[in-house]
């Protein structure tokens, strides 16, 4: 008896459209995290999700969580004695397009205290859901050239030659940042086991 192997295929289909408001109509307002009165340095962050071969990952979903410009999360676990910026929404969720892209309008986050109360470098927490993943993957986006990166306690846990995979790079225009997120392969982004 000859057995035919099962075809290699990713899990799916991935129903991101049910979780990303406005996806079907092209409304990307779920990626606008900074309102008109939001304090801090406004940034436009373009995230591009790529597979092993450097091809765009379509039908993925990206979630961002971050502190406001003063380094305060709008979350009960943040016990700092400060009020979060009421005009800032520290969460955004978008689907990737046919180029693997999604664009968030936010602010550069402030430094937040770490486990030993040492200030962490400005960063954005990222969750990725995509075809072929059985569960989300989680990373951080840091900002290239920020002097707070070097002493950051989480960054120091990552081998030096892998840290670049977590860096957003400045764009041509002021306030624009780009981040390439590689799910697998030789340029794979560092992911955390959370």
Which ranges hold each PLM region?
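Beta-strand-dominated extracellular/periplasmic modules and repeats
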Residues: 1-194
